[in-house]
């Protein structure tokens, strides 16, 4: 039985994680805590799942690593600098693993994988991500990671910049740019989590889209992370790809 704690247990994602942990046959909920609660309640957990806020997650990780507790993190806002800081924390505390996933939806992970595979074959690639208006960061971690994967695949294939004759624009009209890939973030009431990758070349386009209709859709990926994090070969793992054999 894997003993699990949940940070952000009263949030939309955290409350789903609590239900999933309680329902699974091989996991036991030690404690679910939220803002203002004592983190010491999760001492004794094998793994803690963090769905909190970009402003809180680094301090949470520091505390978990210091106390020898594996972490599965769905909180967004991780750039290269933050990942490097997590690696430094882990170097100081052998025996602890951290899994950070931009998206725990297995279909979303497959969408990112397919996008990276398609990228070398198209001149143009842009990403549109759509989320609920309470999301704190933009672009989403999923869109950022997808852009990184597409950018790397394009670079490996020797592709240059995507064609774009824009010389005059309102600030932000062409979106943000991540590794040469334009990313557009929409925040719409009624949405949960959606992403579309649009590829184009002469005479044809390809669209790869993923839609999460509810937060329950992320739970198989979260539980996979909980079950696998302690045995992962790398101290820090980013994304579910290796857990899925991709």
Curated annotation (Swiss-Prot):
Pfam family, one: DapB_N
Function of the protein: Catalyzes the conversion of 4-hydroxy-tetrahydrodipicolinate (HTPA) to tetrahydrodipicolinate.
GO-annotated molecular function: 4-hydroxy-tetrahydrodipicolinate reductase; NAD binding; NADP binding; oxidoreductase activity, acting on CH or CH2 groups, NAD or NADP as acceptor
Binding site for NAD(+): 8-13, 34, 74-76, 101-104
Originating species: Thermobifida fusca (strain YX)
Keywords, comma-separated and alphabetical: Amino-acid biosynthesis, Cytoplasm, Diaminopimelate biosynthesis, Lysine biosynthesis, NAD, NADP, Oxidoreductase
Reaction catalysis annotation: (S)-2,3,4,5-tetrahydrodipicolinate + NAD(+) + H2O = (2S,4S)-4-hydroxy-2,3,4,5-tetrahydrodipicolinate + NADH + H(+); (S)-2,3,4,5-tetrahydrodipicolinate + NADP(+) + H2O = (2S,4S)-4-hydroxy-2,3,4,5-tetrahydrodipicolinate + NADPH + H(+)
Gene3D superfamilies found in the cross-reference section: Dihydrodipicolinate Reductase, domain 2, NAD(P)-binding Rossmann-like Domain
Protein name, entry field: 4-hydroxy-tetrahydrodipicolinate reductase
Binding annotation for (S)-2,3,4,5-tetrahydrodipicolinate: 132, 141-142
Single GO biological process annotation from the record: lysine biosynthetic process via diaminopimelate
HAMAP family: DapB
